[in-house]
């Protein structure tokens, strides 16, 4: 005797497909947020490295030109003391297009207000010390 077996169709139901799409959407939203945050942290670190380079170049310029505390300098004064392999050394601007300078010997370069505000969610004020 032959038993009756219902024909089972292969494939996924609409509900199963919608659940998978919802899970993928949630994972991509989380990943996108983390990528954007990591990018901003990298921008903050790069800006801080640029400020340190400028500070060293300003010190070299001041020693070579016999400048003392309180004397001012422009970016063009310290530019020859920077490595020319990065955008900051060529343009005199940070990643947000803000100009570096003028500088004062012994106080060094400062992070611009625009850059500080743009990166404040990943780099608090203590991060920028002594360049704030």
Residues of each region from the PLM?
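Alpha-helical hydrophobic helix detector
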Residues: 18-34
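Conserved beta-strand->loop/alpha-helix structural units within folded catalytic cores of enzymes
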Residues: 29, 51-57
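N-terminal leader/signal peptides at the extreme start of proteins
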Residues: 1-12
């Amino acid at each position: 005797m032959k038993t009756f077996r219902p024909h089972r169709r292969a494939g996924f139901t609409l509900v199963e497909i919608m659940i998978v799409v919802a899970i993928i959407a949630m994972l991509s939203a989380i990943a996108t947020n983390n990528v954007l945050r990591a990018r901003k942290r990298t921008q903050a670190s790069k800006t801080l490295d640029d400020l340190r380079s400028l500070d060293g170049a300003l010190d070299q310029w001041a020693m070579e030109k016999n400048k003392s505390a309180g004397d001012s300098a422009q970016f063009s004064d310290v530019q020859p003391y920077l490595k020319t392999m990065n955008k900051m050394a060529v343009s005199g601007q940070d990643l947000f297009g803000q100009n570096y300078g003028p500088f004062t010997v012994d106080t060094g370069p400062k992070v611009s207000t625009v850059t500080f505000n743009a990166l404040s969610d990943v780099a608090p004020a203590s991060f920028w010390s002594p360049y704030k």
